[in-house]
Amino acid sequence: MQVPEHVVSLYIATCGQNGSGLGSDEKEIILLVFVLLEVSTGQIVGTKQILVRPDGYFIKDRTISSSSDNSSVTNNTASSPPLAIGDANNGSGSTSGNGNSLENGSELILPIAEAQAAGKPLSEAIEEFDAYLRSLSLHDTEIKLVTDGQLPLRQCLHREASAKDVELPAYYNRFSDLRKEFLRYKSGDLARALVPVKDVKKMLQAPTLPMPQSIAEMLGELNISSVEDNDFYIRESRDMVTVIQTLLQAGHKFAANELVNLVLEPGICSIDDEVDGNCIVRARGLPWQSSDQDIAKFFRGLNVAKGGVALCLSPLGRRNGEALIRFVCQEHRDMALKRHKHHIGTRYIEVYRASGEDFLAIAGGASNEAQAFLSKGAQVIIRMRGLPYDATAKQVLDFFTTGDTPPCHVLDGNEGVLFVKKPDGRATGDAFVLFANETDAPKALGRHRESIGQRYIELFRSTTAEVQQVLNRSMDPKNYESGGGHSQPPLIAQLPTMQLPLLPQVGAHSLSHSLGASPANLCPPVPPPALPLPTQHLITSGTTKNCIRLRGLPYEAMVEHILHFLDDFAKHIIYQGVHMVINAQGQPSGEAFIQMDLEESARLCAQRRHNHYMMFGKKYRYIEVFQCSGDDMNMVLNGGLASPVAQPPPPHLGHAHKQQSLLAATTGMFSSAGQSPTTVAAGTAQSPLGGTHTHTHPHSHAHAHATGHAHAAAAAAHHGLSASSAMLPGLSAAASASGLASFMSAGQQSAAAAAHSAASLQNAAVALAPQGYALNPFSLPPPGSAAAAAASTPALLAQQQAQFIAQQSLLVRQQAAAAALAAEQQQQQQQQQQLYASAMLQQHPLYLQQQQQQQQLYASAMLQQGQPQFVLMQRPSAAYLPPFPLSYMSAAGAASGVGVAPGAAVAGAAAAASPSASNSSLSQSMKRSYENAFQQEAAGAAAAASAAKRALTRQPSSVYSYYNSGI
C-alpha cells in the first residue's frame, strides 16, 4: 500500500468535555489545529489553528440532556454563552482571568471568548484548510490525518458536520489513530529484538501492551518532556506533534487506515447467522417516520454493519419508534452508547445495549424468496402499502414510470417487485420495490399517495431487515390461526376482570315480605358478592351467518358512508348493528362488521355489494363484503380468543325475562336471551341521548348508534315501574272495604320504609367501602390490581373508567327514577294515584265499583263497532334521567356533587338485584291490566297483549303513549 508523503496532525477541542468525554455531551467544536508534517524527515511544513464560532445549533429549541456515560463534567457547563471579550494572551495559550476561558481538566484551558469573538463557522474553517492544501498542490491521496484516538473525528467532526449539513473532503474519511500507531510501534520494537530461539515461546506468552489513554502517557513512555511553544493555543496539541515527529524519525510508517463509512450498505441477515452481542445497541424514541438512513445519519462517524439497521414493527406492522443497530466492532458500539440522549431534531434518542438474539429476532430471515430478492444489490428499497389485492407487477412498474413526476425505473423489472402474501397465497396489499441508485429514492417517494385504479398508494423507504421482518410475519401461520400462544393480538384489547364493590345486594326473598317488617331485613349481614365486569362487550354470538364484514374501507369513512354504500340493504341492519373496528393506536383499521336482521339479508348483501365501489371525496375504492357469523366476528375482534358468553337466566324468571328479551332484541346490542336486566339496562343506558352519531368506546371498538333516547327512557321506565310496584303490598280480589284506605296509604308507608332502609344500606356500604372514600357510586375506587395495571397504560385506564362508569350509570338511573317516584308519592297524592292507577290501583274491586259497569258497556260497544281500544300508559319524564359526567370524581366532589333521595338506594337495588320481584310485580300488574282492560277472548287477549308488549319498545311521541291493540 502506498504511504502518503505528508501526514496532518489534527487536534479538535469542544466547548464542553474533552479527553475521554470528548463529544459525549453534544457540545460544539471551537478549535481546529492542523499541523502538516513531512513523512521522510518529520519536519513541520505548516500550521493552521482555526477558531470555530459555536452557533448554538445543538441547543436550539430544546434542553440538552447529558450523556449517561459521562465520567466528569466541566467547571462551566454553559454551551457557548455570550461571554464578554477580554484581552487574550496568545503567547501563553490562555486568556486573562476574567471568566472568559473554560478550564477542562487540570491544565487544559479553552479559548471560549476568542472563539465567540473571532471564530468562523465550521464550513468556513473546513474550507480554509482545504484551500491551504490546494495552495501547496497537495491532493487527497498525498496526505493522511492523524488524530489522538477515535473520538475527534468519529464523535465530533463527522457528527457535527452531518448535523449542520457540512460536506467534508474525502481525506476526512480515512485517518490513523495515534494511540493504535503508538501501540504498534512499541510492539514492533519487541518483535525486532534479538531473542534466543528457546525464549520465543515465552515472548509469545507475554501479556499484550495496554493502549495509551492520553498524549501525556505517550510522552512518558518515550521519555520526552513537553515542549514550550507559545504559538499554540493548547499545549496538548503541540505535544501531539512531538509524539508524531518521534515516531516518524524512528522510521515508523502510518500505514494503517481507519475508515469512516458514509453510506449505509444493504445486507442480508439470516436467522442462522451468528451475531456478536457486543456490537448491538437499541435506539428508542425515534420519530415514526424515520428511515434507516436517518438512523445511520444519527450515528454518522460510526461504522454500521451491512444491513445493520433493523426497524422494529408493532404487532400491526407499523414502526414503533425503536430500532436495533449492529456495528462492525465493539469499539464503535461503545462510542454509540455515548450518544445516549443526543438529538434528532427536537427529540432526544435513548441508546441502550442489546443482544445478538434481539437483532436476529427482528432482522433475521428464513425466506429463500426474500434472500434472492435482497441479493440483487439495490441501493433503495421502497415499501408500498394499500395496493389492490389483485395488483400485478406490471401495474407497479407503470405506477413508477407514468404520470407527471419524473420516471424512476425499477431494478430488474418484474423481478424487482416482491408482493407480501399470507400463507394461503392471498395478498396483503403490501409490496417491496427495488431501485438501483440512491438518486431514485426521492423520485419514487414523490409519488406518495398517487393512485393505482381507485386506491391511493402509500410509499415508505424500507430496509432489508424490514423486508425480512414483514415476510416472516406474513408467512407465519400462527399469526392467522384462531388459537395458539403466538396468535396476533386482538383488535379489541382484553381487560382484566374488574371487581367493583357496589352497594350491597338485596335478595329477592327480602322483597317478598311485607314492608311493615324491620328495614334491617333489606340488608343481609353477609358481604355482597363482587360484581365481575365482562372483559369485552358481547356483540353477538352463534353460528348463524347473519353478519357481514366490510374490508378496504377508507380510514376516514363514517357510518353514513357505509349506509350509503349498502343502499337498500341498510334497512336490514338491526339497531346498533354497525361496528367500526379500530386498532390499538385508536385509528380506524379499514374494516367494519354489520349485524343484519336475517341470514338471507346478509347473504344477498355480500353477494350483490361485494367489490362495489365506495365514493369518498373524489376517489373511488372498491369494498370487499363477506358473509360471516357472530362467532366469526368475535373471533376476529378478540384476536382468536373465545368471546365472553352471557350467563344463563335463573330458572324462576318468567314474564320479567320475556320483557328483558324483548328489550334486548330491540336494542340489537345483546342478542343472547340469557342476559340479566342489569346488563340490558346497562347496554341501553350507554346510548347517548340524541340523534344519529358515532360513539367510540375506549376499548378500541366503535358502535354506530342510530337512536338512543327512546330506548334509554323505555328501559328506565321499565325498571322504575318494576321497582316501585315491588315495594307495594299485594292485592287480592276479596279485599274488604277497609282495605281501600290501607291501600291508599301504602305509598306513604313504602316511602318511609324506603328511607329507613336506605340508612341501613348506607351504613352497610360505608362499612364495606375502603376507608377514606365517601359513599357515592362515583367515589368508589377500583381495586388495587386494576389500578396498578391502569397506571402504566393510559389506554387501559380509559377502558376501566368506561366500564366503571357504565355500571354506575345504570345504578344512578335506577336510583333517580325510583327517587322521583318516591318524591311524587310524598308530595302529591293525586300524582301517586295517577301513576299506579293503570298498573295496580284499578284492580281493586272497591275502587272500580262505580266505574266498572260503565267501562264494560263502553268496551262492548267499541268491540261491536270494530274500533280498537287504547290503554293509557305513563312513562317517566326526562327529568328522571339526569345526565352525568363521564369521568371519575374526587372523593370530596363525589360526597357533595350528586345527591340521591333517601329511597333511591333501596329502589335502585331492588330493581337491579331482584328479578323475582320484577316477575311478581309484572304478573300482578301488567298482565292483569291487559286481561281486564281488553275484556276479549283468550286468543284476542293474547294478541292484544303481544301488541302492547311490542309497543313498549317504540319511541313515545309525548308524555303519554297510546298503544293501539290492533297494530
Swiss-Prot record:
Bias type Low complexity, positions: 65-80, 89-100
Principal localisation: nucleus
Disruption-associated phenotype: Death during embryogenesis; without displaying dorsal-ventral patterning defects. Heterozygous embryos act as a dominant maternal enhancer of dorsalizing mutation cact(E10) and display a partially dorsalized phenotype.
Keyword terms, alphabetized: mRNA processing, mRNA splicing, Nucleus, Repeat, RNA-binding
Entry's Gene Ontology molecular function annotations: mRNA binding
SMART domains the UniProt entry points to: RRM (SM00360)
Functional summary from the UniProt entry: mRNA splicing factor that regulates alternative splicing od specific genes. Has a maternal role in embryonic dorsal-ventral patterning; such role is probably indirect and due to its function as mRNA splicing factor regulator.
Family, similarity comment: Belongs to the ESRP family.
Record's protein name: RNA-binding protein fusilli
Annotated source species: Drosophila melanogaster
Source species taxonomy: Eukaryota, Metazoa, Ecdysozoa, Arthropoda, Hexapoda
